[in-house]
UniProtKB/Swiss-Prot annotation:
Disulfide bonds: none annotated. Involved in the binding of tRNA to the ribosomes. It comes from the Eukaryota. Belongs to the universal ribosomal protein uS10 family. Keywords: Chloroplast, Plastid, Ribonucleoprotein, Ribosomal protein. GO terms for biological process: translation. The lineage of its organism: Eukaryota, Cryptophyceae, Pyrenomonadales, Geminigeraceae, Guillardia. It comes from Guillardia theta. It is found in: Plastid, Chloroplast. Part of the 30S ribosomal subunit. One of its GO terms (cellular component) is ribosome. This is Small ribosomal subunit protein uS10c. GO terms for molecular function: structural constituent of ribosome; tRNA binding.
Length: 102
């Protein structure tokens, strides 16, 4: 028989917000007597944008911008109803994207 598991994937641009959110989730899960694994860091995705500096000529003069998307995974094994309720009521920062799979 397979045990029930919750997998939480977090994405964000800032690592400090991401780690604080992971710590809040792990703290609430351990407070309700659930076993957690993580935060497991996934590869950071870099997007680089190349833009011409001048509007008309000078193609050799370019500027590069990049965004980095950091990802973490947290697994919660054998969650109970209080764990799920406390995770739903948890308040996380606005810059963090959360995907929850049961």
């Amino acid at each position: 028989m397979q045990k029930q598991k919750i997998r939480i994937r977090l994405k964000g641009y800032e690592t400090n917000l991401l780690l604080d959110s992971c710590n809040k989730i792990i703290e609430t899960a351990t407070r309700t007597n659930s076993v957690t694994a993580g935060p497991i860091p996934l590869p950071t995705r870099r997007k680089i944008y190349c833009v011409l500096r001048s509007p008309h000529v000078n193609k050799d003069s370019r500027e590069h911008f990049e965004t980095r998307i950091h990802k973490r995974v947290i697994d919660i094994y054998e969650p109970n109803s209080t764990t799920i309720d406390s995770l739903m009521k948890l308040d996380l920062p606005a810059g963090i994207d959360i995907d929850i799979k049961i």
